Design a protein with these regions (language model features):
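Amphipathic alpha-helical scaffolding segments comprising HEAT/armadillo-like alpha-solenoid repeats
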Residues: 1-3, 10, 21-33, 40-41, ...
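Alpha-helical, heptad-rich or low-complexity scaffold/stalk segments
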Residues: 3, 10, 76, 93, ...
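Short inter-helical turns and helix N-cap capping residues of alpha-solenoid HEAT/ARM repeat scaffolds
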Residues: 4-5, 35-36, 66-67, 97-102, ...
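Core register positions within helices of long alpha-helical scaffolds
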Residues: 11-18, 22, 46-49, 77-80, ...
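Hydrophobic beta-strand residues in large extracellular and virion-surface proteins
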Residues: 28, 43, 74, 126, ...
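Repeat-solenoid scaffold signature
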Residues: 67, 72-82, 169-185, 193, ...
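Carbohydrate-interacting regions of secretory-pathway proteins
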Residues: 298, 307-385
């Protein structure tokens, strides 16, 4: 390897990676420490792809190499060779690592913790250790909690998201990159309260990713995505929330997307959502659906537009007559809405005159507490309506 050309070195590495000799990795482990720089770099690449439990010790040694190139390669290989028993050693390495090597050390810690039999106790111990400090270095451990993903880890990180905490930004970043969907509630709260544009962007992207991956039912997902759209601070975020509605397949998502079929910044995404939801739900029929599809058809452009137009024409031709869904709310005003008068038994005991009088009072109260706003029905009061 020391005298091999680049092409020859690649061939030799392939041989080491594919060798059926059970001793191959042991030989690599044995020689890597004393090899020249070129050989060490080649063998580090091999160990990052093929290793055994004894490989970690050699990598840890090379993390202290005076050769910066070898040291960097050793950090790159570290997550691929660590064992469960190495966790404490990795934490020690993480505490001393240069900024450019921190991510590799964090990933190695996550790997060593993932299937560790003592994982719960390790997390509690690590949580207790960092809880005593607000030093910037404590944030180095946040991605480990995010990667582990337990309730204990979530509790640890949410302790840092108060407005006056100096590690708040790092904690938010950890919540947004959580390895499962358990941080969704925390992200939902932050979505509705975070004002800083940079932090909001982190929260928003994490929220959308977590919500899409969650087991939240499609109707609730639709509501949350519509919320995300309203809180979005720029066009990219609005398109992201709008596009995610496609997977919910709900009529509410379809109707919401249809509102943006003529918006110059959003009509491309809205068109995609409308076409796909209607194509996947043949029961969505009626005048509104026809009009939305016709608008979507007019928005199409590009190499596939003719094919997609034909698909819409065919869909419209096959669509049964009639209405599948009639909204109680017209999206504009409170026409047809009435306040609730008592219960059915009491109403039945009232005279027509008494009922009419009480209905007038209930309607007035209803209009004080409810209003149509931006296509939504909004409750703004504290009554029983």
């Amino acid at each position: 390897l020391a005298t091999a050309s680049t092409k020859e070195a690649d061939v030799l590495k392939t041989l080491l990676l594919t060798s059926k000799n059970a001793q191959t990795v042991d030989v690599v482990n044995k020689v890597i420490g004393s090899a020249d720089e070129k050989t060490q770099l080649a063998l580090l690449d091999v160990l990052s792809k093929r290793s055994n439990p004894n490989s970690a010790a050699q990598i840890f040694n090379l993390l202290n190499s005076s050769n910066s190139t070898v040291k960097a390669a050793a950090y790159t290989a570290l997550p691929n060779v660590v064992n469960d028993k190495d966790f404490d050693k990795i934490i020690e390495v993480l505490g001393k690592a240069d900024a450019k090597d921190v991510n590799a050390a964090q990933q190695a810690a996550i790997v060593a913790l993932q299937n560790n039999a003592d994982k719960s106790n390790i997390v509690k111990r690590l949580s207790a250790n960092i809880s005593r400090s607000l030093a910037p270095s404590s944030a180095r451990y946040f991605p480990i909690f995010a990667g582990e993903g337990s309730d204990e880890s979530l509790k640890t990180i949410t302790n840092y998201i108060s407005q006056d905490n100096p590690l708040r930004a790092d904690a938010i970043k950890a919540l947004a990159s959580w390895s499962n969907t358990s941080s969704l509630d925390a992200l939902t709260t932050l979505l509705r309260t975070e004002k800083d544009a940079t932090l909001f962007s982190t929260v928003f992207d994490g929220f959308i990713r977590q919500l899409n991956a969650s087991k939240v039912n499609n109707d609730q997902k639709t509501i949350l995505l519509k919320d995300a759209f309203e809180y979005a601070q720029n066009t990219r975020q609005k398109n992201t929330a709008l596009g995610s509605l496609r997977a919910t397949g709900t009529y509410s998502a379809l109707a919401f997307a249809s509102r943006f079929l003529e918006d110059k910044d959003l009509k491309g995404t809205a068109t995609d959502v409308v076409m796909n939801i209607t194509a996947d739900n043949k029961s969505f029929i009626g005048t509104d659906v026809r009009q939305w599809l016709e608008k979507a058809q007019n928005n199409l452009s590009g190499s596939e537009s003719s094919y997609l137009r034909e698909a819409i024409v065919r869909h419209l031709a096959e669509m049964p007559k009639g209405e599948s869904y009639v909204s109680m709310f017209n999206g504009k005003d409170l026409t047809g809405w009435k306040g609730l008068v008592e219960n059915p038994i009491k109403r039945a005991q009232m005279s027509a005159k008494e009922l009419a009088a009480k209905q007038e009072i209930a309607d007035k109260k209803m209009r004080e507490n409810w209003k149509a706003e931006d296509g939504s029905l909004v409750f703004s009061g504290h009554g029983d309506n």
